[in-house]
Amino acid sequence: MENTIVVKLGGVASDNLTEDFFQQIIQWQAANKKIVLVHGGGHYITKMMKSLAIPVETKNGLRVTNKATLEVTKMVLIGQVQPAITTAFQKRNISVIGLNAGDTGLLEADFLNDANLGFVGKITKVKTDLIEQLLSENIITVIAPLGINSEYDWLNVNADTAACEVASALQAEALYLLTDVPGVKKGSEIIGEIATDEIEKLQNAGVIKGGMIPKLASAAFAAENGVGKVIITDSLNTSGTKIKNKVAIG
């Protein structure tokens, strides 16, 4: 969708909601850009689980999600994080609406192929009609990373993956994956640009590690599936690392 920008807010979403962030949003809207936000909430989910004495377990960077964890995840994402984000926009008189998988089956999903993860899924389809209708009315759309499968099970979805699926489905002109670092680092230097076919080499060399591995895998998917540009950064106002769908030279 021409002029559409998708932004994935970091795990501590409130850290991204600075005045510089909102000024960039306002500038984009003045330039007739349509904006979709996909938010995570891992920090808040973990905090709530600990307060309820529910064990926190992860596997390969994904939260193991049993029934209790799923209910906490839904409660925090839909009842705490998303309203905080939409309220911040409303305070600045910016039209916004929060959506989740329960709204017209917005994000269809299926279980990941790992029973040990529990109610963790992958997006199989993004119903873009509702999003496009809201964007046509210049309403910023805020989406929680939850999916529903054909049996109407709710599934926890990695927020980076969800953002990349949404951006690809909309054929967005740009996707910004906001995180807690200013880009992909090699030593102390930010790598300005990475081709999708360089990622495995950088991972094998130990340059890409930890949580950056699944983030780059998601970014590569978006770059290879029609998103105009994909940027990993900590701010909309910094250049970060651009992920490009091209063959690396050398």
UniProtKB/Swiss-Prot annotation:
Any one GO MF annotation of this record: acetylglutamate kinase activity
Reactions catalysed: N-acetyl-L-glutamate + ATP = N-acetyl-L-glutamyl 5-phosphate + ADP
Subcellular location: Cytoplasm
Transmembrane parts of this sequence: none
Gene3D superfamilies per the UniProt record, alphabetical: Acetylglutamate kinase-like
Gene Ontology terms: cellular component: cytoplasm
Keyword Amino-acid biosynthesis among record annotations: yes
Keywords: Amino-acid biosynthesis, Arginine biosynthesis, ATP-binding, Cytoplasm, Kinase, Nucleotide-binding, Transferase
Signal peptide interval: none
Enzyme Commission number(s) of this protein: 2.7.2.8
Positions of substrate binding: 41-42, 63, 156
CDD domains with a match to the protein in the record: AAK_NAGK-like
GO aspect biological process, one term: arginine biosynthetic process via ornithine
Family as reported in the entry's similarity comment: Belongs to the acetylglutamate kinase family. ArgB subfamily.
Name of the protein: Acetylglutamate kinase
Gene source species: Listeria monocytogenes serotype 4b (strain F2365)
Gene: argB
